[in-house]
Amino acid sequence: MRKVSVLLFLAWVCFLFYAGIALFTSGFLLTRLELTNQSSCQELPGPGPLPWGSHGKPGACWMPSRFSRVVLVLIDALRFDFAQPQRSHVPGEPPVSVPFLGKLGSLQRILESQPHHGRLYRSQVDPPTTTMQRLKALTTGSLPTFIDAGSNFASHAIVEDNVIQQLNSAGRRVVFMGDDTWRDLFPGAFSQAFFFSSFNVRDLHTVDNGILEHLYPTLDGGSWDVLIAHFLGVDHCGHKHGPHHPEMAKKLSQMDQVIQGLIERLENDTLLVVAGDHGMTMNGDHGGDSELEVSAALFLYSPTALFPSVPPEEPEVIPQVSLVPTLALLLGLPIPFGNTGEVMAELFSGGSDSSHPHSSALAQVSALHINAQQVSRFLHTYSAATQDLQVKELHRLQTLFSKASARYQHFLRDPQEAEAALSTLTAEFQQFLRGARALCIESWARFSLVRMAGGAALLAAACLLCLLASQLAVAPGFLFRPLLLIPVAWGLTWTILYAGVSVTTGSKIDLVVLGAVAAAGSLLPFLWKAWVSRGSKRPLAPLLPVPRPVLILLLIRLATFFSDSFFVVEARATPFLLGSLVFFLVAQLHWEGQLLPPKPLTMSRLGSSAPTAPPRHSGAHALWLGIGLLLFTRLAGLFHRCPEETPACRSSPWLSPLASMVGGRAKNLWYGACVGALVALLVVVRLWLRRYGNLKSPEPPVLFVRWGMPLMVLGTAAYWALASGAEEAPPRLRALVAGASAVLPRAVMGLAALGLVLLLWRPVTVLVKAGAATSRTRTILTPFSGPPTSQADLDYVVPQIYRHMQEEFQGRLERTKAQGPITVAAYQLGSVYSAAMVTALLLLAFPLMLLHVERVSLVFLLLFLQSFLLLHLLAAGTPVATPGPFTVLWQAVSAWVLLATQTFYSTGHQPVFSAIHWHAAFVGFPDGHGSSTWLPALLVGANTFASHLLFAVGCPLLLLWPFLCERQGPKRRQPLPGSESEARVRPEEEEELQEPLMEVRLRDAPNHFNAALLQLGLKYLFILGAQILACALAASILRRHLMVWKVFAPKFIFEAVGFIVSSVGLLLGIALVMRVDVAVSSWFKKLVLAQQR
């Protein structure tokens, strides 16, 4: 089997999984139709005259305006409790001291001194709680969909009707300053704008200070009708430090001064709106739907009396989208066409000078009626354009609205029993509006069951292919190359057929369906052909070759994907499953008798065969490996982030950056520990390379390990020092610190890239020495005429070269007898593959560590230690000298996958959007990336899926390590002085003198080597594919579950992206092994050619 065939076959299998994931995703992730219809003053939302109070008003549009100006202060991530008044201390209870409590004192003073002028609300936010989706909701009044969360940093212009567009249509002057996301959402919509980059979450002050530079001059200038200021410091402080850091108190105090300054400058016709777009978790993150994330603050204030009654003791809870119709009607604008929010009715009370006895209540009902008309029109238009809305519920709501609207018109003609009638109308309109919103929330989950079923079936078929092909890969005489040509031909045929039908019918070619058709068309013929060929060549093997204990553990893990409760505790369940598998591995060694004490060796009689070799590992050695692995797994579990659903859990404080620490001494101690972890990791790898002799090679990769990697450690340590103390630097040095913070990470990443290039260029780390031969003249090479011209010739001569190369490789150069022949000795061939793999993993680990917070370097150290111990434990029970094909056991692959998952959680990640480490996008780019989105996405993705990448690239070590751990056979007994054995070597002792072949044993059977790599890749893809299949089935079966968008959908997305990263890493890792193998073949060929001269 050729190397190219192995890579192509694995790439084809990956394509099958990709096609299944894409097809399932296109049918599962909800979307909704965005209507481009617009409201206008000339077209009322429903039949009938202008509402009450609009007659005789100049420029009346649906309702007369109450305010001519609005100042909207949007404080990003202003959680409700940040603005909640601090309660007085109750005697007998411990005082509460939290940095964010009571810092917005101006709000509390207004609520106490002017209760009719200001009001604080708890704004209930619709998930996802990402900034771009919240801005869309705050301007359109529509509900976001789950798929919108992926567009948070790829904002596009809003095409739906919105408040900004209505302001422009009415000729109002809109001035904006702050978050530059608004520029992408509303291009050219502002009469004046001051945009500031919003993506650098480590920068707490640039945006806010830039706003303050223009806010008060613009406010006093008067050339505006709506002024919008979007502050980002609170949100960035939460991302960088969390809400409990003293910096949060400073930032909130700054916002309080801003609010107080605005209140002092407002005129009577101006409304002040202070709002948070979303909240934040206890860690300062957002994006999910936890109570802290969906609870934002909303404060309204006017110099004139705004509310007819005093505020309640507990602030009222209102949907965030209610602000859109409220602002539109208060400003005399049409409500945006797609709004689903409900007006805040108490803001529409009639004045005390009105002639109507119930003017206040009637004005509120009129606002609700207009709002209900607008929502009813939207539902009618939307249901006509798509079939998303439930017909039965839609009909019930339309009946409710028709009755309430008729009763309202009748009341205007005959206002009898006004108080009871108005109360009934208010309740009916509110019931309709809330029911309509609930209908939209429930119905905007557009599932295509056909695509979901097709995607799941394609994933299941790909898993079956991996299971079947992994058995066929090591079958004698089985050829994959001709078998692969059939599915490729069928896939191309079905692709051309589908494209031709689409073009003929005039329908648009769907790339997702095209890929699925190609995948299915290529997969089914292969399964049929493989099954027939398999059955004809040998008896049927069991369909489930996975050992029963491993199968049980795998089924338990897959079953947990169907429970939201297990998702919550997966970070703790994964180490338990890993520990159970380690216990099974140790128990298996015990069952095989490898944990028993070795029997005493007996001397054989003269002339008998030599004694057998001792076991490769003692029982105590394997037992200590298992205990050490469990201990390191437990230590890695100390680094954990608690999910939102476990409020009693406390996340590890070690996952926060050193910059968030207050104590200087503790920060210095932790910094020393982090640098120590870097040094220890480098030392461990260098000691390992030195043990196997690869560190003595003069090749460029080894020289880079000696000199380049210490520079990488130094650069990383220097960057951490600057990042942890950048805010404490003197002002005159801050520019230098900022420049160094950009240069150092790029230098480390550049060095890592250089090391990988050198490794690919010269991957063979072998030391060759030439010297005078000893007195022994025994010839070690079988006579061979001419250079090797085929792979078979090379496979024949290579083992002979290596078995005696360290003793005497006799050249045929022309030398005098006095000088003697020249001997060439080569070292480190036994670990040539593993040395390249370990070096590559270390080169990848340093940039990935740089993308994490400093203390996660301890997790990376534990990662390498866990991997080394697991590899040694697996090697203890894997025979390498037995005849037959090479293979990697299922329990080894399962343990490797579990270790990758455990490291994912230990590095502070969770399969939820709110736990994504956005700060990684600014490592090396403190000033942001401009308009580029692919580079920050790459950095954040590398941070999130670092464990998937490292373990996938290192997967071939599962095959290589047992050969690396092959030990030397028994040494030759010392001859008696003066005996004949001093001058002659017996054949028995000659066999005992042989060095272990170790990884060169793989060179004895290159076809078996390539087949083993293929089988390893298929087994790894099977386990990963089984996990993504389980997530897809869970999401489809539980698509109407309460937690589908909170738990199952994010888990599916993370598993899907993790599978893609792992599959790419697996291909790269196997390709690197093959590159080393090609280089080793070329190296041997050069030696043979030199021998011929």
UniProtKB/Swiss-Prot annotation:
It is a multi-pass membrane protein. The chain crosses the membrane at residues 4-24, 460-480, 483-503, 512-532, 669-689, 702-722, 748-768, 831-851, 856-876, 945-965, 1018-1038, 1052-1072. The keyword Transmembrane helix applies. Its EC number is 2.-.-.-. One of its GO terms (cellular component) is endoplasmic reticulum membrane. It is found in: Endoplasmic reticulum membrane. Its main location: endoplasmic reticulum. SUPFAM superfamilies: Alkaline phosphatase-like (SSF53649). GO terms for biological process: GPI anchor biosynthetic process. GO terms for molecular function: mannose-ethanolamine phosphotransferase activity. Keywords: Endoplasmic reticulum, Glycoprotein, GPI-anchor biosynthesis, Membrane, Transferase, Transmembrane, Transmembrane helix. Residues 971-991 are annotated as: Disordered. Pathway: Glycolipid biosynthesis; glycosylphosphatidylinositol-anchor biosynthesis. Glycans are attached at N268. Belongs to the PIGG/PIGN/PIGO family. PIGO subfamily. Forms the ethanolamine phosphate transferase 3 complex composed by PIGO and PIGF. PIGF is required to stabilize PIGO. Catalytic subunit of the ethanolamine phosphate transferase 3 complex that transfers an ethanolamine phosphate (EtNP) from a phosphatidylethanolamine (PE) to the 6-OH position of the third alpha-1,2-linked mannose of the an alpha-D-Man-(1->2)-alpha-D-Man-(1->6)-2-PEtn-alpha-D-Man-(1->4)-alpha-D-GlcN-(1->6)-(1-radyl,2-acyl-sn-glycero-3-phospho)-2-acyl-inositol (also termed H6) intermediate to generate a 6-PEtn-alpha-D-Man-(1->2)-alpha-D-Man-(1->6)-2-PEtn-alpha-D-Man-(1->4)-alpha-D-GlcN-(1->6)-(1-radyl,2-acyl-sn-glycero-3-phospho)-2-acyl-inositol (also termed H7) and participates in the tenth step of the glycosylphosphatidylinositol-anchor biosynthesis. This is GPI ethanolamine phosphate transferase 3, catalytic subunit. The lineage of its organism: Eukaryota, Metazoa, Chordata, Craniata, Vertebrata. The gene is Pigo.
